[in-house]
């Protein structure tokens, strides 16, 4: 399922043009590429559930969103998000890329993935996908994109 999310993000979602996508033909295309139908449906369902936040996240952002808080992770969350992942989420909060609300959306979407443990690289993709899909998070998305993809270039110069 995770590979499908990355594939969709790189080939469909991140595309600036807003084309209407026929889910049946998309499912067939993904199946033809070699993805399993069950994983395709799970990935599309994951994205559909993410779209539920599009309407609710912006009004719910409160004045405390920019304050750094300590998130206590449940045992299940700690198993799926290792120390590096939890540290990276805190790092993004400190950079004000994530708010309390977007952090919670990201954690909730991660918990819905059908994987046992997320690695740091996969977490970065999930954060990009979530921020890209929530209206009002464009600035945070671009900050993260610059941080992730321009970091090596900045070191060289």
From Swiss-Prot:
It holds the Pfam family DUF494. InterPro entries: Smg. Belongs to the Smg family. This is Protein Smg. It comes from Buchnera aphidicola subsp. Acyrthosiphon pisum (strain Tuc7). The gene is smg.
């Amino acid at each position: 399922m995770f590979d499908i999310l990355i594939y969709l993000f790189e080939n469909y979602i991140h595309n600036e043009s807003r084309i209407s996508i026929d889910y049946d033909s998309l499912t067939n295309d993904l199946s033809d590429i070699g993805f399993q139908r069950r994983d395709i449906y799970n990935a599309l369902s994951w994205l559909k559930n993410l779209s539920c936040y599009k309407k609710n996240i912006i009004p719910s952002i409160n004045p405390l969103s920019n304050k750094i808080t300590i998130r206590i992770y449940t045992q299940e969350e700690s198993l799926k998000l290792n120390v590096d992942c939890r540290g990276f989420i805190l790092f993004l909060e400190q950079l004000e890329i994530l708010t309390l609300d977007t952090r919670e959306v990201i954690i909730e979407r991660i918990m819905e993935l059908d994987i046992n443990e997320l690695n740091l690289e996969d977490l970065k993709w999930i954060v990009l996908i979530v921020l890209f899909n929530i209206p009002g998070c464009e600035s945070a998305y671009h900050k993260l994109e610059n941080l992730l993809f321009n970091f090596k270039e900045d070191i060289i110069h």
